[in-house]
């Protein structure tokens, strides 16, 4: 475990209390637009060491008697079979996955709303499927002039034509499988219909980043810009908050740009707006739970560097854009980030130069730097993994964890019978052979038991490593970056 910069227990307590206050402020009913990742928020855990990836869902569990989940999905995304790139499943399948997860955690899922519904065949099929599964579902329609034509939006022909979502709890959490799903529009539609029914209700927004009460150019906020460099999101000073209160806070450009329109919609629906600024709309308390600013600054700078290497790698792979790299270079300059902040970078490059072959290096949680080189039987990633396990287990480097009598037949199998060009073992293959060796070799067993100790290590490689290796390191909690070049000049890479 590395240094802690964030008090997670304090966050769970203060964040849930803040949401309760906002519910009370609006007379007992709040629509909370939940942005970002509800589960597995690894970005937050990387830049705020001590933040647990499941903190947000655990916080909601503390409020579970009050919580009702509404999941929004854009009907157009169903029609287009839009995919979640990180999971490899369509948005509609992800809705079902989310429902299962929420239910497993004891949270009540009230309904699913199909936004921008326009009679799409695939959307109708999904509605039918939901109904057969016993899930309540509603339809919201495209509104001409949204979001700027306030008079039309706040009318029976605008929000008024949407289905009213029946709810039974005081905290309605509106979430979605991805961006552009209509979460905010769903909340506004509900406010309109509740007001017509004489029901007091309010709206708030839950976004972890940017952290409103940290400086604009704080590395934690710059790391958010790095994470969204492929989008048009830019952190900025909230001018409305500054004008209303004389206090400098940070928000991102889309919320600042849409605020005058939202304000007008609130006024049209409820007679007056409850908010004077986009910052007012938020309920995020993460900034109040930072207990070591320097730890969070250092972690955020490392995150920015990783994002930069990822963008450069994706550019080589044909998946990225030059503009993204340029934005990240600017963020690096603002945060004072260079490759030298990660000792693994220089160590990997030095090892590669010394051996004339791909190499890697890893900074262990205790600060030790371990290297790994390419051999006849092991790729650089597999060699680095074994060397790191040896170091954690204090196993002398001269001892073999896996004998050549085991490694060489596996390499032969790959090239002779499985048509692999590369005989060297990847990390998943070397872990399987390590597990087998552990049955008869006590040192291999000792090394295998060190796997949990790899979490929060930083690794860098002199070339782009395989997807298989990346997946294994990710599962082990090792953060990886690569130089933006392939081992070979071949055009097709796996």
Identify what each model region corresponds to.
Residues 1-175, 190-351, 357, 364-366, ...:
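Flexible phosphate-sensing "switch/lid" loops adjacent to ATP/NTP-binding sites
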Residues 186:
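Hydrophobic positions on the alpha1 helix immediately C-terminal to the Walker A/P-loop
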Residues 377-393:
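A short, polar/charged loop-to-alpha-helix boundary motif
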Residues 391-423:
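Short HxH-centered metal-ligating active-site micro-motif
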Residues 178-179:
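The conserved Walker
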Residues 373-374:
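Short clusters of small/polar residues that mark proteolytic maturation junctions
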